[in-house]
């Protein structure tokens, strides 16, 4: 019986120790919770809030950067479209200017050709007039020479005819003056 009693006493003591252990553990745990709340929980919560604010700030910054990038891309696209339009307009203006220059050159060539033709016509007309004048002069000289020869031969033999011809000539010249 002794053993049974001792075993029962050991169990009761063990229960008592277990209960005391449990109470001490609970008290230590509660003290630890109070200390954690006072010293660690505030800084931990503050650190988590700061981290949360930092992450939110980074997200906002990233969102703003994304929006700025979208605006920049739109601006660049607009500038690119504007540059393409300006380039197309410049090419069109250059083409029109080249066509106008070509038309102007063609017109100038046509005018110069017409002037050259007209000048050639005038030169031909002038040369023809000179040739006609020279021909008339030659014909007149030839006619005079022929008439002189005829007159010499005819008047050389007839002195009365010569005298009448000279008188007639003098009368004609006096009448025209």
Curated annotation (Swiss-Prot):
Protein's UniProt keywords contain Membrane? yes
Its placement in the membrane is given as: Single-pass membrane protein
**UniProt superkingdom:** Bacteria
Alphabetized Pfam families for the sequence: ATP-synt_B (PF00430)
UniProt lists the family membership as follows:
Belongs to the ATPase B chain family.
| Known role | F(1)F(0) ATP synthase produces ATP from ADP in the presence of a proton or sodium gradient. F-type ATPases consist of two structural domains, F(1) containing the extramembraneous catalytic core and F(0) containing the membrane proton channel, linked together by a central stalk and a peripheral stalk. During catalysis, ATP synthesis in the catalytic domain of F(1) is coupled via a rotary mechanism of the central stalk subunits to proton translocation. Component of the F(0) channel, it forms part of the peripheral stalk, linking F(1) to F(0).
Give the protein's recorded name: ATP synthase subunit b
Species this protein is from:
Exiguobacterium sibiricum (strain DSM 17290 / CCUG 55495 / CIP 109462 / JCM 13490 / 255-15)
The gene name reads atpF
């Amino acid at each position: 019986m002794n053993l049974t009693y001792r075993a029962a006493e050991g169990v009761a003591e063990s229960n008592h120790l277990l209960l005391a252990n449990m109470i001490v553990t609970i008290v230590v745990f509660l003290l630890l919770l109070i200390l954690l709340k006072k010293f660690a929980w505030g800084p931990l919560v503050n650190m988590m809030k700061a981290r949360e604010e930092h992450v939110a700030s980074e997200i906002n910054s990233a969102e703003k950067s994304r929006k700025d990038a979208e605006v920049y891309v739109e601006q660049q696209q607009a500038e690119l479209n504007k540059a393409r339009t300006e380039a197309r307009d410049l090419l069109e203006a250059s083409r029109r200017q080249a066509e106008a220059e070509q038309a102007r050159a063609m017109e100038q060539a046509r005018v110069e050709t017409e002037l050259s033709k007209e000048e050639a016509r005038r030169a031909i007309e002038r040369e023809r007039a000179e040739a006609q004048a020279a021909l008339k002069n030659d014909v007149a000289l030839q006619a005079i020479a022929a008439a002189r020869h005829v007159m010499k031969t005819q008047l050389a033999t007839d002195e009365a005819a010569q005298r009448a011809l000279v008188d007639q000539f003098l009368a004609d010249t006096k009448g025209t003056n």
